[in-house]
Amino acid sequence: MTEEEDREAAADMNLFLQRRAIEQVKKSVSRTYILRDDNATDSGRVIGYYAISVGHLVPDDIPKVVSPRMTIPVFLLLRLAIDKDFQGKGYGAKLFVHVLHGLVRLAEETGIYALVLDPLNDHVRLFYEKFGLRSLPGDAARMFIRVRDVEAWISQTRH
């Protein structure tokens, strides 16, 4: 990333938290979870955050063996961002594991087939591939992982 791209990413992260996250929570469109640095002198600097919601996939997006005719409920990861000063220190993985645990809890209560997200770029795509996400059949730009695969990953890694 260039210095200019760094500044733009930081500004986007801050703008989302200051404006859009609050609006979306008030409208019950999504929820945003924040990870703070409790050791910071400025009363808990934001390390990173993620925003989630729920949605559905239409039959064209998923294999016919899953559902030949009906829509499938999914958990959407709308955003996951880490402050540039904290990148490369494992915080992205920590937040994503938190997302995965939330997915499993929600699936137990409501019935969710998968987590779906739209990676920002190839670097981000590689990050999610490490957790077992793959391209969504019918929409290669999106990625997904089934709940049962998340449950297996959690039990194998004991996260």
Regions inferred by a protein language model and the residue ranges of each:
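Non-catalytic substrate-recognition and accessory regions of acyl/acetyltransferase enzymes
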Residues: M1-K89, A93-V116, L120-H159
